[in-house]
């Protein structure tokens, strides 16, 4: 039997590098909403394509924005 060919995953482009964003601020709600699901959960970095350091900064900024009521803790809910 022939060995199955492995597909190489397509590398994700970093959305922060593409938009030339260097500073992640908790007051930039429009940017932070791109990294939150419709349920209000923080998206994983394998989904968003950011680096480990950027993911940490994004997560901290989202948590700070939630604390000062700029972002909700949860999404719209079930219905």
Curated annotation (Swiss-Prot):
Which Pfam family, any one, appears in the UniProt record? Ribosomal_S18
Q: Name one GO biological process term.
A: translation
Subunit notes for this chain? Answer: Part of the 30S ribosomal subunit. Forms a tight heterodimer with protein bS6.
Membrane-crossing residue ranges in chain numbering:
none
Q: Which NCBIfam families match?
A: S18 (TIGR00165)
PANTHER family documented for this protein: 30S RIBOSOMAL PROTEIN S18, SMALL RIBOSOMAL SUBUNIT PROTEIN BS18M
Question: What family is it from?
Answer: Belongs to the bacterial ribosomal protein bS18 family.
Q: What does this protein do?
A: Binds as a heterodimer with protein bS6 to the central domain of the 16S rRNA, where it helps stabilize the platform of the 30S subunit.
Would you tell me the protein name for this molecule? Small ribosomal subunit protein bS18
Q: Which Gene3D superfamilies match?
A: Ribosomal protein S18
- Report keywords, A-Z: Ribonucleoprotein, Ribosomal protein, RNA-binding, rRNA-binding
InterPro entries in the record, alphabetically?
A: Ribosomal_bS18 (IPR001648), Ribosomal_bS18_CS (IPR018275), Ribosomal_bS18_sf (IPR036870)
Highest taxon of source? Bacteria
Which molecular function terms from Gene Ontology are attached? small ribosomal subunit rRNA binding; structural constituent of ribosome
GO cellular component terms given for this protein: cytosolic small ribosomal subunit
